[in-house]
């Protein structure tokens, strides 16, 4: 799992604490890292024993009140090693959401994904209303003399710019995977970008549903996928477990979003950020409560 040069804003301060499965038998013996990641912190006890913890919590993404990550990491380890029982998969995903502080905080901290979701609605909703040529002009994406997949690459860059943070990176990866639905339509290089004008009229809803499914899955793998790598019997077993998780999340999310007003998701909709965050919360709630 890539952590980047700094601690991922997706994860709480205690994420790297020992979880009972650590490769280091004494994780408490590791020196505490300063923000620059190079020097151990001096052991100067604070008058307020919770002061340091409070400071770290405030530096987390959107400052949600995270709970311990140990149950999430332990249950994912059990599931990956085949010791989780019949409910191993559901428990692993449920504890993962709980470790984000519950469905509300899991949704609230997914800011990059929320922005990208709205951007998908803006772009493909615009294609339905105005046509792809006009929408590309609106987004300053050149067409002349370019292959469709080159144009699609620009569309991805507009909807989810090159990431600066791990949060952005997961959101972008989810978009790239979601856009495979569109890329596949241009496997025949003779096809023109105007093909987008003839897509299913519900393409915006289809892509938004796929994006939310994919983001939730990719975020889980980013956060606790290392448990699968370490505890699965081999690479084939790990791939099977990841596939099971992906299908489980996709089923729950698609069912949750089935009758939701996805077609109105765009920047012109009043309180659209609240609307989209609410959709993420509902999806996370279903996963948290194992509904």
Indicate where each model-derived feature is located:
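Long amphipathic alpha-helical segments with strong coiled-coil/leucine-zipper propensity
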Residues: 105-213
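Short linear sequence motifs
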Residues: 59-62, 72, 89, 204, ...
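Alpha-helical oligomerization segments
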Residues: 222-291
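Basic amphipathic recognition helices
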Residues: 202-226, 230, 242
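Solvent-exposed flexible segments
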Residues: 154-158, 170, 174-185, 217, ...
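Extended, helix-rich scaffolding/adaptor regions
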Residues: 1-154
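Residue-level detector of solvent-exposed, low-hydrophobicity positions
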Residues: 22, 73-76, 86, 103, ...
């Amino acid at each position: 799992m890539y952590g980047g040069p700094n601690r991922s804003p997706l994860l709480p301060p205690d994420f790297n604490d020992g979880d009972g499965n650590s490769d280091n038998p004494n994780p408490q013996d590791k020196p505490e890292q300063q923000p620059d990641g190079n020097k151990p912190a001096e052991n100067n006890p604070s008058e307020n024993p919770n002061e340091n913890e409070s400071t770290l919590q405030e530096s987390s993404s959107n400052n949600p009140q995270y709970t311990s990550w140990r149950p999430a990491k332990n249950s994912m380890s059990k599931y990956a090693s085949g010791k989780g029982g019949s409910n191993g998969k559901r428990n692993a995903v449920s504890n993962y959401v709980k470790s984000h502080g519950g469905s509300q905080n899991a949704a609230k901290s997914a800011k990059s994904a929320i922005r990208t979701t709205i951007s998908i609605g803006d772009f493909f909703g615009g294609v339905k209303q105005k046509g792809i040529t006009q929408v590309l002009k609106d987004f300053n994406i050149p067409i002349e003399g370019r292959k469709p997949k080159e144009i699609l690459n620009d569309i991805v860059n507009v909807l989810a710019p090159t990431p600066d943070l791990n949060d952005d990176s997961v959101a972008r990866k989810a978009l790239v995977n979601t856009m495979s639905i569109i890329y596949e339509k241009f496997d025949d290089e003779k096809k023109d970008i105007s093909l987008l004008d003839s897509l299913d009229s519900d393409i915006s809803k289809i892509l938004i549903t796929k994006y939310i499914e994919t983001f939730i899955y990719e975020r889980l793998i980013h956060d606790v996928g290392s448990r699968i790598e370490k505890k699965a019997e081999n690479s084939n077993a790990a791939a099977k477990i990841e596939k099971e998780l992906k299908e489980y999340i996709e089923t729950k999310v698609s069912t949750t979003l089935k009758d939701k007003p996805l077609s109105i998701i765009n920047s012109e909709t009043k309180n659209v950020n609240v609307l989209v965050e609410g959709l993420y919360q509902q999806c996370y709630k279903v996963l948290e409560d194992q509904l």
